[in-house]
Every structure is written in C-alpha cells, then in structure tokens.
Regions:
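Conserved GNAT acetyl-CoA-binding A-motif
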Residues: 111
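Acidic (Asp/Glu-rich) sequence patches and key acidic residues
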Residues: 1-106, 115
Length: 115
C-alpha cells in the first residue's frame, strides 16, 4: 500500500482548536500519493501555514503531521500544484486542484494530514 497524504477543507475553523486526530471524513479529504508530495515540499516551503493549530505559525507542509493552510496561501498552493511537471498525468493532482479552487472560492482554510 502506497503512502498517502490527505487534503480537505475546514468548514468551520476554530482559533482555539488543536487539529491532531486523523479525521479525513470530517473534512471530505482527497488523497495524494507521497511520491508526488515529496516533489512539492521544496516549492511549498515558503507557503505560510500553521502546524496543528492557528497558534503555531509555520511554513510549508508538516510532512508527518497536520498542516492548516489559510485562505491567503491558497493561490500560492494552487500555483505550485499546477506548475508541477506531471500535473496533467496525475488524477490525484487534478483532484487536489479542484479542492484548492473550492476552498479559494469559499474563502476557507484547508487541512493537510501527512503520512
């Protein structure tokens, strides 16, 4: 079984909550293979994010943890994913692009659940 990362949309962000449990169903997550995410880590390293709660500002994705991606970072996230060399051949990335666009349109935070 291949390792996967999960990406979803947080419908009601809670400033005090610590997101630490595996809840892909709650956020209607889609899966992206680890091999793809490994190639995106460096280009995403300058993206403003939070690790586990809004009280922990960081940059990039928490590879083995939970990342909260704020609405102001979604354009950068989308640009990196779209510019990935194998974007057109990847069903996973096509689904991720749809999820990012939905979050942008709804001005919502995204959640990344690492491996």
């Amino acid at each position: 079984m291949a390792l996967e990362h999960e990406f979803g949309i947080i419908n009601d962000i809670n400033n005090e909550k610590t997101y630490q449990s595996y809840t892909p169903d709650v956020h209607n997550c889609i899966s992206v293979e680890d091999d793809i995410i490994e190639n995106l880590l460096e280009p995403l390293s300058a993206m403003k994010t939070y690790f586990h709660s809004l009280n922990r500002p960081e940059y990039g994705l928490a590879y083995c943890g939970i990342t909260i991606i704020p609405p102001e970072s979604l354009s950068q996230f989308l640009d990196v994913v779209i510019s990935y060399k194998d974007m057109e051949e990847s069903v996973d990335l096509s689904e991720l692009v749809k999820k990012i666009i939905q979050a942008k349109e709804e001005n919502k935070y995204m959640i990344h659940i690492g491996i």
